[in-house]
Amino acid sequence: KELLRRAARAFGPREAVSRARCVVAEAEIGLVSRELGGTGKALAAARAMLEEHGDRVNAAHAGLLEARRFLLIGRLDEAEGKLAGLDPALLPPASRTAHALVAAGIAMRRLRTDAAREALARAGRSARLAGIPALTAEVESAARVLCTPAARLVAGGEERPLLLEEVEAVLASDLLVVDACRFVVRQGGAVVPLASRPVLFALARALGEAWPADVSRAALIRRAFGSKLTDESHRARLRVEVGRFRAEVRPLAEVTATERGFALAPRGAREAVVLARPIEEEHAAVLALLADGESWSSSALALALGTSQRTVQRALDALATAGKVERLGRGRARRWITAPVPGFTTTLLLPAPLPVG
């Protein structure tokens, strides 16, 4: 990267295209090494310069890098917009493969599994034309996401793993879904967000897991407040929180009182289910990003997660203490890695909204 920076600085005002090509090459290295901050504006300017001077191939490649960066940091609308403005026919086979992989990645994050399969088929064809074994392996790895459990369905006291296409089907059904991946209660196109109200979501999940049975007041107090002891103050607080929860979900379900506690009664739905993450891990989103096998800086993780670097650093320290991640390097050069977790895909652990309707 430093050599490319020096080369870019060495080109004079009349060599703007050469300078722009160096910026694009530097951005590609930064993307691979997960240095995601500060490259967006420079890359956009380089792409504009290349387009202005008729270098359509390198301009398209720069646009593809922009789309890949947006996908990595979870800005799916921008990634989709960049792809829409690119003509894959201008790209060589290797870059066409990358274009299709970005399209597949966006589709998976949006739970559009048919579109993801179509994009992966295009990626496979382009990879074969490119004749690069590593690229073919990347396409095969991306395709395995569709064949790997992405979530768990908890219903009637039992649970089973779900593939992405099954998650898509559950969300499109008339089931009342307590979505523990995005912390909402939903049925069809109606969504009640509870991410900022953890007590109410804890009640929702407990009632959803037990449906059609009820949940005792003592069990709800444990789930919602983390208290093993039950006294009159806890019972009074539970009544207040159940009232708030009842008001929030009224369009979708009733919350009925029973002799020993409360039960969920979906409106117009056949049954209630809970869509749970494939693993219960406090810092699951951090692990999901690291699971791509690349080494990430804490600043890049913070950018991708849309949170503060301090929050990410605390999560990394906790994961390192638990032996789930490893540190590489020191100071500003420090990077973090983890081994991919076998047995499930991390798509639903990433901070992207699920489809609303």
List each model region and its residues.
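Tetratricopeptide repeat
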Residues: 3-7, 39-46, 79-86, 116-123
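DNA-binding patch around the recognition helix
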Residues: 231-273, 317-333
